[in-house]
């Protein structure tokens, strides 16, 4: 589900978010980034 990676992958506000990106990709998203210590998945299916 969309927010599954948020709870799973805590990350620094600025810095490493590799686990977040991997989690999001496994969940079917294009990747992920870190905002305010939370993982946010990026999904580009708007084409």
Swiss-Prot record:
Its main location: secreted. The keyword Secreted applies. It is found in: Secreted. InterPro entries: Ergtoxin, Scorpion_toxin-like_sf. It holds the Pfam family Toxin_17. This is Potassium channel toxin gamma-KTx 5.1. Belongs to the ergtoxin family. Gamma-KTx 5 subfamily. Reversibly blocks Kv11/ERG potassium channels. It comes from Centruroides sculpturatus (Arizona bark scorpion). Expressed by the venom gland. Disulfide bonds join 5-23, 11-34, 20-39, 24-41. It comes from the Eukaryota. Keywords: Disulfide bond, Ion channel impairing toxin, Knottin, Neurotoxin, Potassium channel impairing toxin, Secreted, Toxin, Voltage-gated potassium channel impairing toxin. One of its GO terms (molecular function) is toxin activity. The presence of a 'disulfide through disulfide knot' structurally defines this protein as a knottin. Has the CSalpha/beta fold, which comprises one or two short alpha helices connected to anti-parallel beta-sheets stabilized by three or four disulfide bonds. GO terms for cellular component: extracellular region. The keyword GTP-binding does not apply.
